[in-house]
């Protein structure tokens, strides 16, 4: 038996008047996901337990089969693992976004989806100018980077994800509580370093958003995981452009497969990801394939971009993997789902249950649900499930 878990980050949404009160999933052309729903079993999954914020860290940890109530310690330490940054017992890792501030407001949480090459120059400059015995900077991908603070600094600081406060006044959401003043000062110091940096001057000349500030959030200590093999008896791999997902995979003992051209945006290498997944399953039991683009489009509030991201996910990820599964001599089980909704109307994550569909190529008792979307799956046989139980269900379907 082979297993494929296909995650369209942030795909779920709310009904949109412009689409005749349908969601984007309902309006999008998604024949591959519809086929999986029609020939498989469907339901709704709660990926965010009560008391947890609806972050991709919590939601994807659940999808990977790890209960956040047991394993979650913060987002940034997971990203640190993917970046090869080892954390000491008293190290606190922070996500460090490169953002755009304009007229005292957070204009763009991603600095115009700045390129990794430009971002690395800026982060290296920040590390050179602002690094101390207390904090170190590490470059990541695009706008997503890392700060590591020693001696438990910032462990209890109250921070807000920048994608939750786009358009809001920066000063209203600076880090608060214990050590908040230190990290607020670090943010302010970063603007001095970045504002007139040659990379940003060039971006402004080109009409792009400058990366003129950092923003810290998502901090935590290194978590302790049981491996996926220990929990579920399966070998596996993760394919994603995003350090968070790769970090979860590393802690779970999964192989991390790097795909050239995987960007975490609409221009990602879909075909490369699908091919890598098919190749990975030749020597492993299970593969997770994660696509970030629908989530990014949701944060931008773009109906058109989110529609395209979902349709590309369906035609360029789900479809080729489904066709491979159906042509294979081995039995395949495919799970398709988002991790959480990222509605374009609110431009951030919500904690609503998400639709899922499970299809086994030799199954004979499908639910007969016609479409894969937030409403149709409610007619499936699986009901409402705890997402961290899904992997266990998957290997038993």
Swiss-Prot record:
It catalyses: (2R)-2-phosphoglycerate = (2R)-3-phosphoglycerate. GO terms for molecular function: metal ion binding; phosphoglycerate mutase activity. InterPro entries: Alkaline_phosphatase_core_sf (IPR017850), ApgAM_prokaryotes (IPR023665), Metalloenzyme (IPR006124), Pglycerate_mutase_ApgM (IPR004456), Pglycerate_mutase_ApgM_sf (IPR042253). Keywords: Glycolysis, Isomerase. Pathway: Carbohydrate degradation; glycolysis; pyruvate from D-glyceraldehyde 3-phosphate: step 3/5. The keyword Amino-acid biosynthesis does not apply. It is an enzyme of class 5 (isomerase). SUPFAM superfamilies: Alkaline phosphatase-like. Its EC number is 5.4.2.12. GO terms for biological process: glycolytic process. Pfam families: Metalloenzyme (PF01676), PhosphMutase (PF10143). The keyword Lipid biosynthesis does not apply. PANTHER family: 2,3-BISPHOSPHOGLYCERATE-INDEPENDENT PHOSPHOGLYCERATE MUTASE (PTHR31209:SF4), COFACTOR-INDEPENDENT PHOSPHOGLYCERATE MUTASE (PTHR31209). NCBIfam families: apgM, hyp_Hser_kinase, PRK04200.1. Belongs to the BPG-independent phosphoglycerate mutase family. A-PGAM subfamily. Catalyzes the interconversion of 2-phosphoglycerate and 3-phosphoglycerate. This is 2,3-bisphosphoglycerate-independent phosphoglycerate mutase. It comes from Methanosarcina acetivorans (strain ATCC 35395 / DSM 2834 / JCM 12185 / C2A).
């Amino acid at each position: 038996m082979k297993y494929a878990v296909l995650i369209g980050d942030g795909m779920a949404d709310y009904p949109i008047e412009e689409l005749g009160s349908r969601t984007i999933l309902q309006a999008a052309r998604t024949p591959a996901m519809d086929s999986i729903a029609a020939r498989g079993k469907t339901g709704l999954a709660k990926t965010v337990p009560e008391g947890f914020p609806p972050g991709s860290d919590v939601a994807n940890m659940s999808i990977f089969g790890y209960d956040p109530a047991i394993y979650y310690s913060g987002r940034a330490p997971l990203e640190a693992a993917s970046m090869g940054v080892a954390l000491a017992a008293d190290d606190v890792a922070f996500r460090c976004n490169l953002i755009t501030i304009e007229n005292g407001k957070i204009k763009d949480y991603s600095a115009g989806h700045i390129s990794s090459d430009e971002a690395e120059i800026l982060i290296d400059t920040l590390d050179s100018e602002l690094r101390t015995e207390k904090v170190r900077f590490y470059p990541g991908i695009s706008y997503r980077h890392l700060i590591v603070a020693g001696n438990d600094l910032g462990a209890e600081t109250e921070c807000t994800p920048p994608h939750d406060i786009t358009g809001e006044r920066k000063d209203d959401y600076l880090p608060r509580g214990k050590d908040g003043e230190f990290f607020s000062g670090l943010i302010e110091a970063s603007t001095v370093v970045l504002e007139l940096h040659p990379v940003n001057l060039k971006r402004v000349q080109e009409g792009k958003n400058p990366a003129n500030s950092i923003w810290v959030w998502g901090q935590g200590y290194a978590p302790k995981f049981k491996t996926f093999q220990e929990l579920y008896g399966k070998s596996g791999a993760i394919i994603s452009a995003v350090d968070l997902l790769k970090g979860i995979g590393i802690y779970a003992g999964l192989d991390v497969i790097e795909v050239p051209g995987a960007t975490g945006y609409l221009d990602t290498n879909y075909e490369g990801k699908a091919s890598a997944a098919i190749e990975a399953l030749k020597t492993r039991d299970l593969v997770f394939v994660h696509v970030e683009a629908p989530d990014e489009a949701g944060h931008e509030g773009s109906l058109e971009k989110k529609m395209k991201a979902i349709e590309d996910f369906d035609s360029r990820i789900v479809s080729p993997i489904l066709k491979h599964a159906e042509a294979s001599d081995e039995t395949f089980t495919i799970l398709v789902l988002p991790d959480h909704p990222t509605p374009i109307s609110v431009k951030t994550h919500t904690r609503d249950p998400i639709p899922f569909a499970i299809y086994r190529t030799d199954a004979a008792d499908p639910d007969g649900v016609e479409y894969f979307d937030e409403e149709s799956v409610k007619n499936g046989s699986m009901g409402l499930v705890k997402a961290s139980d899904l992997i266990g269900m998957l290997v038993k379907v």
